[in-house]
């Protein structure tokens, strides 16, 4: 594996945007019947769905199948996007987001271990965890009983955690959407992903059930108006730029699609190569997945801000919150307990004043 990691490290490098193609591919034999296929694409021409499409088409071609002709090309989508900006529906979406983020925008202030770099650092690591099966079952039940989704339940719990740690009751969380709103877009390779900046305002005198209803409605509205580019929103809001932070939010929440990534053919099988995680696109990103009823998660965190012990503690507190709301969703947010007495390395020594 160390040899494979060395190949990958030498393979992945910056692209010159002035020179096509923004794609490189390499196949290396690492054993008698083992190969490493590497492909590197600039994010402006691809997204996660694109990667899956490439693998699926590669499998079809390997088996001698003909690829289905595409109904449209990415350039058609780009033209449609430009035309869409002139329509009234686009103006309605713009109005929604400007209203949603009106007023003074909150800046998330989590306790950190080290001084924030003057310029954003993308050095990071990942910490993975699994939620107890009984708690997972309870969370699924809450989602079903409240007419919400597991995504909404987990996102709401995450905002409670952030509010407990930051002492803030006004938060903006980023969440990605695939952006492929038409079936014709599904098989295309290109950059369709948009990120939604969703505002959350948990209050200590609310029950989790009540807060979840608010979060559900807010999330549904955001997804209804998802087809409005984040970069356009940042420009319209005229956010004061700070080189040490993202313009609108410093944390993301993602619920991952857990389709099997291993493919087996008659004479070949392949699966993703798992490499040690060393980047963090934001201060903190919580990614969750639901695999056959079992909820798993991971924190991607900036190592210039947080120590590993701090993230382990954050994880324990998240699981504690999930356990408490799983047992009693009518618990007041202010009564939800976290392990605030523990002070591991990795957070600043200042006490954490909880808002609840």
Residue ranges of predicted features:
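Alpha-helical sensor/transducer elements of the RecA-like P-loop NTPase core
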Residues: 3-7
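Adenylate-forming
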Residues: 8-16, 21-30, 40-44, 56-64, ...
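A Lys-centered signature of the CheY-like receiver
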Residues: 47
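Thiotemplate assembly-line natural product biosynthesis machinery
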Residues: 92-97
């Amino acid at each position: 594996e160390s040899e494979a990691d060395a190949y990958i490290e030498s393979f992945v490098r910056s692209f010159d945007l002035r020179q096509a193609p923004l794609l490189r591919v390499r196949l290396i034999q690492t054993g008698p019947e083992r190969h490493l296929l590497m492909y590197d694409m600039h994010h402006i021409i691809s997204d996660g769905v694109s990667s899956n499409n490439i693998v699926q088409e590669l499998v079809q071609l390997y088996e001698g199948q003909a690829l289905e002709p595409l109904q449209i090309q990415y350039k058609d989508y780009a033209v449609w996007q430009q035309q869409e900006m002139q329509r009234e529906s686009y103006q309605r979406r713009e109005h929604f987001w400007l209203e949603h983020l009106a007023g003074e925008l909150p800046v998330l202030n989590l306790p950190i271990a080290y001084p924030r770099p003057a310029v954003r650092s993308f050095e990071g690591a990942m910490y993975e965890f699994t939620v107890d099966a009984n708690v997972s079952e309870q969370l699924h039940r809450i989602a079903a009983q409240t007419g919400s989704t597991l995504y909404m339940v987990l996102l709401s719990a995450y905002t409670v955690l952030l509010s407990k740690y930051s002492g803030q009751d006004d938060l903006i969380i980023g969440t990605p959407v695939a952006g492929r709103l038409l079936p014709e877009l599904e098989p295309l390779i290109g950059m369709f992903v948009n990120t939604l900046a969703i505002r959350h305002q948990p209050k200590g005198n609310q029950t989790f059930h009540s807060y979840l209803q608010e979060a559900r409605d807010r999330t549904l509205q955001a997804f209804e108006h998802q087809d409005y580019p984040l970069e356009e929103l940042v420009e319209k809001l005229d956010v004061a730029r700070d080189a040490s932070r993202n313009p609108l939010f410093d944390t993301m929440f993602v619920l991952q699609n857990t389709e099997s990534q291993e493919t087996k053919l008659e004479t070949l099988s392949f699966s993703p190569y798992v490499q040690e995680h060393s980047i963090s696109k934001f201060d903190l990103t919580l990614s969750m997945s639901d695999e056959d009823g079992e909820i798993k998660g991971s924190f991607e965190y900036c190592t210039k801000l947080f120590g590993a012990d701090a993230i382990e503690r954050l994880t324990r507190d998240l699981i504690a919150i999930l356990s408490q709301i799983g047992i009693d969703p009518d618990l007041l947010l202010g009564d939800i307990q976290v392990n605030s007495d523990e002070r591991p390395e990795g957070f600043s020594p200042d006490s954490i004043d909880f808002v609840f």
